[in-house]
């Protein structure tokens, strides 16, 4: 059975371009006139860019990159023009990536929390020729370039607010490149043949690496332009007249943040950009800029629910909707937030780097708590059971297979390894277990169960760690949680949880009492195979990949 998007959003708002770079597509926009209105605002300094400034900075950066690297937009293979960006969120992060595209190159996005070994490995995989980074990461990145035998002149500074105030000697900065571009000739337009945007890679994006190995997903220009159009169509904003103000806290070094940012600019929304996530600073931004839309992850929602004092730090009355991605948003968490903020629309979604990035999202047209919404237009989905047979019914879980114009070109690896990402008919094998259910209004909704490799069998019963994690996060004394299966002589497997205690709730409880409280909390709603008993370990932090997902293979080493 092939599942598709609802009938009311089956057609895209406009045709997917076949010969356009993603940056040019976003800068042209959806037809909404923005004039001098700020589209990008630095939360720390108030510095802003309107559409004209953005276009000018991309143009001048491209001129300088062409001179510095000696590249011509229409000569040489894009694979030989890979430039990396390893930085926290900077005003020029995305404009820089678009300038790289304009000289015929590919942008490798690298997370700023990556180790030197990780950076070295990914840059070597990509044959990266140069790297832009922020001041805090200069020592690490200098060592990486030296290990890769790249000249120090191939390291550049992408300024953050603090960087712009320093007088210390630094590598050539983006600001200097833009200034130099004023006196340089224009860059020829990249000449894409009809249909070439489907194959030309725009970004190399590391996957989440929750199993310990990061692959580089090849995301093409058409992948992203498709996903932008898919998102605005389902979201119902394709024909709206009033742009919104959005909170920009997602890391631009991750596909979720990168595509969400591009979508907002395409719609001519204003993005209030934070270099790093800081809850009090984010809340102050909401009050100062009257922010209406928040792009967040479930951990942020859980923090708000479990720490009501946060609602008193700022006036949040402007907020209208939360787009929640990266992990499923449980029905319990939705209910808890609705009790304190009933006027907020919680729009849960599902995506993955390999789909660049959104696959489904909840629309205001059809809300089904606990689901990750409806499939985006032009997305097709199948569910395959453990026996390899295709599932034909609702409410039956199976591995999720996808087809969409936003699906990546493939991994940057040998064909033999890459072939495991797709089946014989070209469907992406996600590795996620999911089901479809019909909501009260009769619309199909997608539910994510867990990663296939993470599901354990307790006394022959399938137990999804995500279900236990969801319940744990609803305990007021739990800030973070990660669950996986361990061997058990009697049951085959049993769940084991790593828990980060709240620093604000039940701080006086000793570990034994808190462990019992958590166990009772689990017992209230989950059956015996899901119980943790004494399988709880308290830790200061949970190691995470660059997508924010727990690195469970590292936790298993701590038992």
UniProtKB/Swiss-Prot annotation:
Keyword check for ATP-binding: yes
SUPFAM superfamilies linked: Acetyl-CoA synthetase-like
Name of a matching Pfam family: AMP-binding
Protein's UniProt keywords contain Glycoprotein: yes
UniProt-listed PANTHER family: BCDNA.GH02901 (PTHR24096:SF422), LONG-CHAIN-FATTY-ACID--COA LIGASE (PTHR24096)
Keywords (A to Z) from UniProt: ATP-binding, Glycoprotein, Ligase, Nucleotide-binding
Organism: Aspergillus rugulosus (Emericella rugulosa)
Taxonomic lineage of the native organism: Eukaryota, Fungi, Dikarya, Ascomycota, Pezizomycotina
Record: residues binding ATP: 207-215, 348-353, 432, 451, 549
Region feature (SBD1): 278-348
Function: Fatty-acyl-AMP ligase; part of the gene cluster that mediates the biosynthesis of echinocandin B, a fungal lipidated cyclic hexapeptide that acts as an antifungal agent. Linoleoyl-AMP, produced by the fatty-acyl-AMP ligase ecdI, is transferred to the initiation carrier domain (T0) of ecdA. The linoleoyl-S-phosphopantetheinyl-T0 is sequentially extended with L-ornithine, L-threonine, L-proline, L-homotyrosine, L-threonine, and 4R-methyl-L-proline to form the linear hexapeptide.
A molecular function GO annotation: ATP binding
EC number from the UniProt entry: 6.2.1.-
Domain notes: Both substrate-binding domains (SBD1 and SBD2) are involved in the substrate recognition, and are sufficient to confer the substrate specificity.
SBD2 as annotated region, ranges: 349-411
UniProt biotechnology annotation: Due to their effectiveness as antifungal agents, echinocandin derivatives can be used for the treatment of human invasive candidiasis.
UniProt name for this protein: Fatty-acyl-AMP ligase ecdI
